[in-house]
Amino acid sequence: MKRYKNVRNRDINGILLLDKPKGISSGLFLNKIKKLFNAKKIGHTGTLDPLATGMLPVCFGKATKLAKYLLHSDKRYKVSAQLGVSTDTFDSDGTIISVSPVQSNDYILEQCLESFIGIRNQIPPMFSSLKYRGVPLYKYARKGIYFPRKPRSIHIYNLSLIKKTENIIELDVHCSTGTYIRSIVNDIGEYLGCGAHVIELRRLSVGQYISSSMINPATLEAIFYNDSFDDVQVFCKLDAFLTPMNMIMLELANISNEKC
């Protein structure tokens, strides 16, 4: 059954809180969601690496004008990192560039994590979607071309150890927008003198939106591919997952009042 045959892209408005799966870029994932909803206008509020999973708020229609508020909201992550191994991308998708023994103890690790809390400068990684002369930096990096990057001010509100198993550490990170978790992990590895890289990364919240509100994209696909539903029924069922504009505006107003 071919969906939406001879149906124009729809003008729909709202925010969809999606749980991005592992192994797909935010851009490709966004295109997939756009096709499922047959939406005319869509945008997200900050990319997640292909390796990463978790909260990706997707804005439809008029809600795209409000995306900047979420883009500049603080974020919370759970990250697992392997100590003793460094990669060129700072995560397990990259090439291993060094292997070193891990000699730090729990006390040194706690001191390390505490040193990151607060306002600090962070140099964005070359393997990132930031652009130089209109070209993403990661495309240069893949060719072995590296450029100096200007440090950016970030704020780490919390960086705490959840658990440690041999050379694998699991961390809770609450940070400002624009923070690269991969770079934090790489810097932790440098502090400890052994190197480190991200092996798992999950975004738990964006601003006021938390992980318990997320929708699994498999739920949306099950509706889309259900032959017992016609297009109108599919639209109704999918649209029910959207946070409507009036609720979004109310939430933003409440946030503004809390900051006053």
UniProtKB/Swiss-Prot annotation:
- Catalytic residues (positions): D49 (nucleophile)
What residues does substrate bind to?
H44, Y77, Y180, L201
Going by the record, the broad EC class of this enzyme is isomerase
| SUPFAM superfamilies (alphabetical) | Pseudouridine synthase (SSF55120)
Q: Which UniProt keywords apply?
A: Isomerase, tRNA processing
Quote the InterPro entries the UniProt record gives. Answer: PsdUridine_synth_cat_dom_sf, PsdUridine_synth_N, tRNA_psdUridine_synth_TruB, TruB_C
Gene3D superfamilies noted in UniProt: Pseudouridine synthase
Pfam family of the protein (one): TruB_C_2
Task: Give the enzyme's EC designation.
Answer: 5.4.99.25
Write out the GO biological process terms. mRNA pseudouridine synthesis; tRNA pseudouridine synthesis
Known role: Responsible for synthesis of pseudouridine from uracil-55 in the psi GC loop of transfer RNAs.
The record's listing under HAMAP family reads: TruB_bact
Q: Which family does it belong to?
A: Belongs to the pseudouridine synthase TruB family. Type 1 subfamily.
Q: What is this protein called?
A: tRNA pseudouridine synthase B
Source taxonomy: Bacteria, Pseudomonadati, Pseudomonadota, Gammaproteobacteria, Enterobacterales
